[in-house]
Regions:
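Short, low-complexity N-terminal intrinsically disordered segments enriched in polar/charged residues
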Residues: 1-26, 30
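A beta-strand edge to alpha-helix "cap/lid" segment located at domain peripheries
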Residues: 2-3, 53, 57-113
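Short, hydrophobic secondary-structure boundary micro-motifs
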Residues: 29-30, 39-40, 67
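Helix-to-beta-strand junctions that scaffold the AdoMet/dcAdoMet cofactor pocket
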Residues: 33
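A short gly/proline-enriched turn/hairpin at secondary-structure junctions
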Residues: 36-46
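Short clusters of small/polar residues that mark proteolytic maturation junctions
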Residues: 43, 49, 110-111
Length: 113
């Protein structure tokens, strides 16, 4: 994945996630706690190995760019709205990334349209 750059004041673990999200599943998984949970496209991925596999598979399947547009705090979560463009069904699309942080890492992420 190619990363578009935009000046947002993202919390460090979330900024690290978007920086790592360039097709490197291992780098992405290191942004998460050991027992983190990711929910995306109707699937739940639990723990770093499953998160690494999720990101590696998604990056191999599609080419896309992701540009974070907005960031807000809501109900204890950090919500980042991002614009994605690529060779996936429904492109382009704005997605919302609901992050929960714990100890300087991401403990949960849910991605929704």
């Amino acid at each position: 994945m190619k990363q578009a750059t935009r000046s947002l004041n993202l919390p460090k673990p979330i900024a690290a996630y978007f920086t790592a999200d360039k097709g490197n599943g291992e780098a992405v998984s290191q942004c998460f706690t050991d027992n983190a949970v990711v929910k995306d496209e109707g699937h739940t991925h639990k723990g770093r190995p499953a998160i690494r596999e999720w990101k590696t598979d998604a990056s191999a399947k599609y080419e896309y760019t992701c540009e974070p547009l907005a960031c807000e705090e809501k109900d204890g979560k950090t919500v980042v709205t991002s614009h994605l463009v690529g060779n996936f069904p429904g492109s382009p699309v704005d997605l919302r990334f609901f992050f929960t942080l714990e100890g300087g890492k991401i403990s949960s992420l849910e991605i929704t349209p």
